[in-house]
Structures are given as C-alpha cells and as structure tokens.
C-alpha cells in the first residue's frame, strides 16, 4: 500500500491485460494530495516510442514524469527492445542518488511483453498477462483475473469492468479512465 504524506500526490490504479495477441493498459484519472482530490481527469497512461509502447504510472506525479522521460531516452537508445530499456531504467533508478528517491511504479507494454518496473530495481513480467499497480491495484487485478477466462468478453470490457470495481472500492481511484491498446 502506498504511504500517505499530506504534501505529496499519491494513489491511482493502473491495470494491464494481455490476451489473444492484444494488450491494454488502463488507468484512472484521480490525483490526490493527501486525502483531498485535486484533479479527476489526469492522464496516467501514455504512449511512448512512436506509439509502440504504452506506459502507465502510479505514485508521485512529478516522479512518474521523470521516469517517463528516462524510459523514453532508454527506448531511443534501445529501439524495439522494451525489456532491455526497462532493465537499464531500473538500474539507473536503483543506483542514482537522485532517482533512488523517486516514489512511483510503472507498467509498460509493447506488442510482445508487459512489465512492471519498481523503484527497488525490479522488472517483472506477469505470468498470466495481468498486472496492476497503485492503491486500487489489488482490486483491479482480482477482478481482471476473475473475468479473463469468460468467453465473449473483450479485453477492453474486462479492463473497464475491473477498473470500475477498483474505483468503487478504492477512495484514491475514480471512474475517469484512459485506455490504450496495442494489437499484433
């Protein structure tokens, strides 16, 4: 769970689902300062690297933007190699005195791989194609896993239903979602 400091911006839910040669990343739009909602329509899911990569962040907003910029530069150095770019970012994040203090997590995905990147240097690929981060992450993850094997439901529907459940339960997650999709 994210620690709360009334002077920092925290809390969100980011969910990634990979199924049938498609991947979606969805995130809510709420930004909280302590226990107060200060923005409801933030865009925490973005496309990077010429739209071939989707990234979503949870945690301190300014820290996440710093990480987006760093990841973009790593992707420029290692085009088409998302895993390598993420490992390089995680190394910097863990080793650099300034970056080490950043309080955020990221989910990144391209057409072939989805990864969770943490500030402790972890670069994790979910076993089942479903990953979630943020204050409502466990709610969204549970809901997505429950829905993923149901026939006739699209990957976007799964993502939206899971985020609705997370938004209904987590006070730091709202229903204003941004969803991005990559298909093979």
Swiss-Prot record:
* Gene Ontology cellular-component terms listed: HslUV protease complex; proteasome core complex
Record's superkingdom? Bacteria
Which reactions does this protein catalyse? ATP-dependent cleavage of peptide bonds with broad specificity
Q: What keywords sit in the KW lines?
A: Allosteric enzyme, Cytoplasm, Hydrolase, Metal-binding, Protease, Sodium, Threonine protease
Any GO BP annotation = proteolysis involved in protein catabolic process
Residue numbers annotated as active site: 12
Return one GO MF term: threonine-type endopeptidase activity
Q: Per UniProt, where does Na(+) bind?
A: 167, 170, 173
Q: What is the E.C. number?
A: 3.4.25.2
Q: How is its activity regulated?
A: Allosterically activated by HslU binding.
Q: Which Gene3D superfamilies match?
A: Glutamine Phosphoribosylpyrophosphate, subunit 1, domain 1
Q: Where is the major localization of this protein?
A: cytoplasm
Q: Which Pfam families match?
A: Proteasome (PF00227)
Q: Where in the cell is it found?
A: Cytoplasm
Q: What class of enzyme is it?
A: hydrolase
Quaternary structure, from the entry: A double ring-shaped homohexamer of HslV is capped on each side by a ring-shaped HslU homohexamer. The assembly of the HslU/HslV complex is dependent on binding of ATP.
Q: What does this protein do?
A: Protease subunit of a proteasome-like degradation complex believed to be a general protein degrading machinery.
Family named by the database record: Belongs to the peptidase T1B family. HslV subfamily.
Q: Per its UniProt record, what PANTHER family does this chain match?
A: ATP-DEPENDENT PROTEASE SUBUNIT HSLV (PTHR32194:SF7), METALLOPROTEASE TLDD (PTHR32194)
Q: What is this protein called?
A: ATP-dependent protease subunit HslV
State the gene name recorded for this protein: hslV
């Amino acid at each position: 769970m994210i620690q709360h400091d009334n002077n920092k911006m925290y809390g969100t839910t980011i969910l990634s689902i990979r199924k049938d040669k498609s991947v979606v990343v969805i995130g809510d739009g709420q930004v909280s300062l302590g226990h107060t909602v200060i923005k409801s329509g933030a865009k925490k899911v973005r496309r990077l690297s010429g739209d071939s990569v989707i990234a979503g962040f949870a945690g301190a907003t300014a820290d996440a933007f710093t990480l987006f910029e760093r990841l973009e530069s790593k992707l420029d150095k290692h085009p088409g190699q998302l895993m390598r770019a993420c490992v390089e970012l995680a190394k910097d994040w863990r080793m650099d005195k300034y970056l080490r203090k950043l309080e955020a997590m990221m989910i990144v995905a391209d057409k072939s791989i989805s990864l969770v990147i943490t500030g402790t240097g972890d670069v994790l690929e979910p076993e089942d194609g479903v990953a979630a981060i943020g204050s409502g992450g466990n709610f969204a993850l549970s809901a997505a896993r429950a829905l993923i094997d149901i026939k006739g439901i699209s990957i976007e529907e799964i993502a939206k239903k899971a985020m609705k459940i997370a938004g209904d339960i987590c006070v730091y997650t709202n229903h204003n979602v941004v969803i991005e999709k990559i298909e093979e």
